[in-house]
């Protein structure tokens, strides 16, 4: 018996789909940028201690912690050590020329006279990583050929940013600054810098133009560690000096002047044990050595150090072996931290590509519709090893050919670009971008 045919179901748009005729409705924004505040949460922060500039002060104090500083040095050492370069929008000669101009303006691979130091941008981004947000004012000057070139970027420290001003749609409009001018007695208050004249770095931005410090999750561990160190120092002092005891006559009653004087003597010794003591003839002062051993506080300190490191994306001091010795395999260490480093490098490059590069290109190429981009390449030993092995196989495959150079070149050109660079093959486009700038890009006046 033939099966009864089923009527095909009518296709209807599912959740999240859109009718092609309604595509134009996607243009424009209906939802303004809104503050991420609710109840005790103010701009993503629920702890009053960490709200506003009071929070910035806490993060600044944390920089004196050895574990925090060590982690920051490692993170930004890795970020800076990557191979940074400017990638043109295409292989078109004009796009390559624009990329070469940006490469020269950013001072990549060259911090000589007439070039802006690329490391200054990293210093500004490091402040954003520590405090959540940092910025720099873009200052252009006229070059020898009439082009507007980068004169300098004036760092704007988070301590000097009083407020971010927004437009009616909730988008950032300006930075409101205040602070004392160095080298003079002038105090600037309410200075507004348009957002388009700045390069802004935000760490862990949620879309509301409110960054969050990378140290935020490390604060509880830092506070506990700080309190623990004070207790350890106080306990060690008691073990070294002893507990003071003062024997007084039985006639001295509580609440009398003599009783208060006895309390003051003991108190002064605790605060200043090296000072001398004057006692009445029938009073006796002594110190008692503590016989019990101090508790081992190292595991607690190690725990909080590990918590601080984990909050910053580094896990090197959480892997422990027997006998309390800390160690970690190099390969495992790289796997634990590499993604943290790469994500920060992308965050840095995205801000430069969004807020800085277009502002250097458009004044000189007003009709430009595409821009070069700052990108990076991590040094990976495994890539070179694999490429070298593959190259050996390719050479062996064509070694008996009468026309080795032509075939070898064709094989090399077929390799992925990253593998060719690992082999040391010259990338003609990248070399054209990295050519030293000529005199047209030099300053017509000396940089201040």
Swiss-Prot record:
GO terms for cellular component: viral capsid. Residues 1-25 are annotated as: Disordered. Keywords: Capsid protein, Viral capsid assembly, Viral genome packaging, Viral release from host cell, Virion. It is found in: Virion. InterPro entries: P23-45_portal. The keyword Iron-sulfur does not apply. Its main location: virion. Homododecamer. Interacts with the capsid protein. Interacts with the terminase large subunit; this interaction allows the packaging of viral DNA. Forms the portal vertex of the capsid. This portal plays critical roles in head assembly, genome packaging, neck/tail attachment, and genome ejection. The portal protein multimerizes as a single ring-shaped homododecamer arranged around a central channel. Forms the portal vertex of the capsid. This portal plays critical roles in head assembly, genome packaging, neck/tail attachment, and genome ejection. Belongs to the P23virus portal protein family. This is Portal protein. It comes from Thermus phage G20c.
